[in-house]
Amino acid sequence: MAYISENELKFLRLLERTKRLTKEDMSANVWKVSAATKILNKMIYTLQNDETTNDILHEYRQEVLQLKLLAEAESKSSAEERLKVIEKIPRVFPDVQVTVADSKNDNEAESYDFEKESAAGLRATQRSIYRSDLRKQLLSSNKHRAQDTSEDQEFMKNELVEEELANSLATMARSFKTMMSAAGDVIKEDTERAILMAKEVDDNKTALGIQSERVERHAYKCGYDCFKVMLIVLIFMSFVSMVLMMKIFKKAST
């Protein structure tokens, strides 16, 4: 469950209250919805400074845009003009998730559960109402009215199916984005580890080269020292031999 700021919580509460107003009685609450959208836009401007809302600000803006267009459509005089405004509402965008937890401490969290109003439901309901009004202006028979009601219900059903599909696609896209981001982090971490290991190999190779040079110099020095010792021993033995020979020849001559 995500933790949100106090400003975002206030925004979500007002957003859901406004959506309920449009569902209850749009014609009677149009001025309230219009005023609420202005406040919501100001609150979105404040939320731009909150880094935790960057990923969902676009969805917030689309939700507020829909409410603004619903209020604008209701203020039009004819059903045809209302339908034109309704068609401006984005057909595909996910509902804002408003089941959240607000916590100032890590140990305490207060949960806030909202009664969610579907964006597709609001849009489909108002469009159905305006379509019905337009048909009533053109067709007055009971037969046509019954047929229009059936068509409106089918239209709302199709709208909800499309919205559910759009939400599923949006969820899959977010999941794919998260997976790609995680894979990128893993690849980056592995690359850094490989670079570090390559550096360690180079350092070890350099250290081994230095150590080999030291061993080579030490071996050369040891060989040179051994040669000097052997030369000294040879000279000493030659000297001793000469002394012995001199003594032997001296005794022989006497």
Curated annotation (Swiss-Prot):
Keyword S-adenosyl-L-methionine: no
Pfam families noted in UniProt: Use1 (PF09753)
Topological domain spans for side Lumenal: 250-254
Stretches that traverse the bilayer: 229-249
InterPro entries listed in its UniProt record: Vesicle_transport_protein_Use1
GO terms for cellular component: endoplasmic reticulum; endoplasmic reticulum membrane; SNARE complex
Localization per Swiss-Prot or TrEMBL: Endoplasmic reticulum membrane
Protein name, UniProt field: Vesicle transport protein USE1
UniProt GO BP: protein transport; retrograde vesicle-mediated transport, Golgi to endoplasmic reticulum
PANTHER family assigned to the protein according to its UniProt record, in alphabetical order: USE1-LIKE PROTEIN, VESICLE TRANSPORT PROTEIN USE1
Membrane topology: Single-pass type IV membrane protein
Keyword Transmembrane helix appears in the UniProt entry: yes
CDD domains cross-referenced by the UniProt entry: SNARE_USE1
Family label: Belongs to the USE1 family.
Function: SNARE that may be involved in targeting and fusion of Golgi-derived retrograde transport vesicles with the ER.
Gene Ontology terms for molecular function: SNAP receptor activity
UniProt topological domain (Cytoplasmic) ranges: 1-228
Disulfide bonds, paired cysteine numbers: none
Keywords attached to this entry: Endoplasmic reticulum, ER-Golgi transport, Membrane, Protein transport, Transmembrane, Transmembrane helix, Transport
